[in-house]
């Protein structure tokens, strides 16, 4: 291969790398502005593909063909780089537009200039490659492979290196620098390339047009590829989670298959033989459709395969990411390699013309237009209406049908090949692809630390023991409800997001009740519906209106299985359900809330992570009344201490006064004014039968049980989070760091670090009947929960204030549990001196006898 071609291939490789970097950054910036709904995602993808299709079509004009291809390509790259640097303010302004349809239109228009330039690059470079005796399909296959190979590196370098190093927006400078390198490098090397303008005249008697069948084929290939990609992305999120790393690995693997397929096709294509090219193209469609359907069958075993990998990587992030690549490759590579072959094969089937660039432009434009249609229809329509499996099946059948049409029109029609394609259609129609939903919905990846102790047989039995009550592939997530014994679990993309188990039940109810200790809220916003328990808890209070924001309609459907626990909040006229992206809705809503509860609890999940940033907390704060409160829930499990400190510090930056409650599930309450808790109000809440019963159901039988769940106050937060960095939309700190520690168990060490800064709860209480009584109640609750140090401190302070039988008895019990026998005996004797009822005295006397016995402790 000549040095000229090597240089052009290298330039196109770098162009693909920069293009995918831009796509990732622009997609994230746009979704932050217009919301991360399925329609928004589809619109952004379609805007990219559609803009590139327009660019390719424009590049096919003879007016463009007469330009110097190297200079034109260099200019296109330079323009894209400049536009990338200018784009952030343009994209940011879209957020201020209220109407979503106008936002979508503006997003499309904002991307058009750059994507048109990107789409024009392949047809332009094809003309530079025309100076060769090499078959056109070979050169174009190599070009396409080089560009796609660069695109493979784009998401990997962006997520694994550029985002963590320089942040989201500065990554645009990295991409722009690559484009500028290509631009100026080509211009400087132009003399060595020896290329100039090309005269375009059709060969005598031959047409420069492209057969409609070829346009339809590459268009359908592009559409089916995007349907597969969207469906596979959802499938893989149920197998190994949807962290930013998993998503980038999935995208890179998808593109890798296309690059390999195109490169191999270019390598093995021979000289033209009449009719053979069409047959080869049809066979590529048959292979892609067949492998797509086979991927559904393979996916059934992938959760168990992931667990096998987990046992070997033992928490290593690098091995985890490699296992994600292997799993993604098993699903996608065979099909995408066949898809990668379609464009070179279609070029090979073109009629001869002196304007090869124009023909390729039309083909490439049709392929990209199909991709745009496939992306939009899959994201906004197919997955929600047909589901994952049947969307893939529909796309596969369409591809096979097109293959039959091509075979029938081919001069070298093969009965055998036609029979294979027809049989494949019948087989796909006959087989039910929806098997394995239970295994995928079970979410083996999320509990891998526990499940790794089981052999595969036992694990399969455990999965089978979970009855699948509900399953729906929604626009943004796959939602399931599973039941084992009396426990029901809400699964979103395989991860348990809610359940009626004791731990989850307590947290879901508590975040609906706890904020009312700080404010008598009348208008409340709840971000995330989940099981509906939190909204149900809020509605037990005398609120005037509750706005509940949920992005996934299937979650609302699934919540009906939790009506015994949530009280069917949908029937309450005070509730307004808002289906959409909460962040976007809060930004455009001019109303004010006394209380906002942010229920999503997983900072490592893509699409959820932007609800834990400084930017979101500022948006939420701007929608609170002067005395308003934001309540934030997040899990400690799977979080490192550094990530936990960063999240709390970010919350603290926005809210001057912060109190943290609970343990493995941490609940933050933030306000502009000091957070104080009225003991009188707390008792009144418990006196309300509906609220008291709800709290008791959550395992909080007494008011003091709520109080002792306080872990940090503002002073403790400052000490715990000292010098912790902020988590922002731009640095993506939590989204990038949390997935790396997902399988670590740092909960105990985090809680131990927090205990060093345990607050004096009494200092945050008002309307106390007496401090001695309150401290005695706190000591009792601490004692019950096993926090003996805190129990002892409050019991001693209670006794120091007032000597009472109950106070002395409790102090003696705590000291006995701590093994301090002599001090326990003295406290219990003090209880007897203080009086007490007969039954209580008998209990104390029995304890004293136990302490006096040789085995007493």
PLM segments and residue spans:
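Alpha-helical transmembrane segments of multi-pass membrane proteins
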Residues: 1-684, 688
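SAM/dcSAM-binding transferase cores
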Residues: 679-771
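Alpha-helical tetratricopeptide repeat
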Residues: 769-783, 809
